Amino acid sequence: MQGIAKIKEKIFEEATEQKNRIIEKAKKEAAEILEKARKQAVQLEAEAEKKAKKVAREEKRKILSIAELEERKRYLEAKQALINEAFVRAENKLLNLEPEKYRDLVYRMILAAAVDGNEEIIVSEADKEKITPELLERVNEALKKQGKAGNIRFSGEKRAIKGGFILKSATVEINCTFDYLLKVQREELETEVARILFEE
């Protein structure tokens, strides 16, 4: 009986040792798994942070780029509005010249524009008080001295003209209205106007 008890004891001892070895091994493996998982978690966290920073940087760059484009667009719109206003003011100044200065300007313009001095002149209703028959007499006298016909006369034709005039012959029409002349010269003048307005 003692022999059996001894065998049982040995079996229990062996089982206990085996159990302890298994537990130790399991603990060690668990610790290794946990350490590996912790390292992976740290790595993943670092990668996620790196990605998040990259995404954030990209998003920031995108937002700033859009904001810069919008700012530039607004600046160009404001710049264009100021240039437009400068041309509108220039036209208004021409339209609102004192009658004598206005007549003098139109006088010089007709002399420069007349081809043979045998044209009709179309003017706005508002300008009929400034561009008078007396003015055309002066113009015709000056044209005759230049060797031209000296026969500029009022046309019965009506056009929507704000200021200036149109000279018309049987074959040609010369537009000397202020808005047209400003429009024609705008491309050339716009750069200069912009330089004056926005000189840096």
From Swiss-Prot:
InterPro entries on file: ATPase_E_C, ATPase_V1_Esu
Q: Name one GO biological process term.
A: proton motive force-driven plasma membrane ATP synthesis
Q: Name one GO molecular function term.
A: ATP binding
Statement: the UniProt record of this protein carries the keyword Ion transport:
yes
Q: What are the record keywords, sorted? A: ATP synthesis, Hydrogen ion transport, Ion transport, Transport
State the family it belongs to.
Belongs to the V-ATPase E subunit family.
Identification of the protein by name:
V-type proton ATPase subunit E
Taxonomic placement:
Bacteria, Bacillati, Bacillota, Clostridia, Thermoanaerobacterales
